[in-house]
Amino acid sequence: MQLTNFTDFGLRALIYLASLPKGELTSITVVTETFDVSRNHMVKIINKLGQEGFIKTVRGKNGGICLGRPADQIIIGEVIRSIEPFNIVNCAPEFCHITPACRLKTALAKAKQAFLDELDQHTIQDMLTENNELLILLKRV
């Protein structure tokens, strides 16, 4: 199963924010430069993550972004459910004439659920715990 770039970069942004010292704000520009992604794309991602409560935005001269809740309370499966469209196949009868008898949609739904069930066992904090290699890459050690 492949996640959209939107979700991929959203998870990366959360991991980056979790690597910051508690209470430290950063800018969207810093996040975009860290992952070499378009600023416009990252603004949309940060806005969505903010709407979902995963990121807190602070306006003003000394503003920035940070996690909206502790990293050990941000469940990866929950993040993905919030921002990933999950249109695995188009099963509308006007697009596929075998829809009434097809069992593929059910099998794919079960696979998606197993995928999310596994990701529900992991938090953003889990991605950083005892992971000095990642912290070095994020320049946090």
Swiss-Prot record:
GO molecular function: 2 iron, 2 sulfur cluster binding; DNA-binding transcription factor activity; double-stranded DNA binding; iron ion binding
Domain of life: Bacteria
DNA-binding region location: 28-51
Domain named HTH rrf2-type: residues: 2-129
Cofactor(s) needed for function: [2Fe-2S] cluster
Keywords: 2Fe-2S, DNA-binding, Iron, Iron-sulfur, Metal-binding, Repressor, Transcription, Transcription regulation
Residues where [2Fe-2S] cluster binds: 91, 96, 102
Cellular component GO terms held in the UniProt record: cytosol
GO biological process, one term: negative regulation of DNA-templated transcription
Keyword Cytoplasm: no
Family matches, as InterPro entries: Tscrpt_reg_Rrf2, Tscrpt_rep_HTH_NsrR, WH-like_DNA-bd_sf, WH_DNA-bd_sf
Manner of cofactor binding, per the entry note: Binds 1 [2Fe-2S] cluster per subunit.
Role: Nitric oxide-sensitive repressor of genes involved in protecting the cell against nitrosative stress. May require iron for activity.
Protein name, UniProt field: HTH-type transcriptional repressor NsrR
Organism: Aliivibrio salmonicida (strain LFI1238) (Vibrio salmonicida (strain LFI1238))
Gene: nsrR
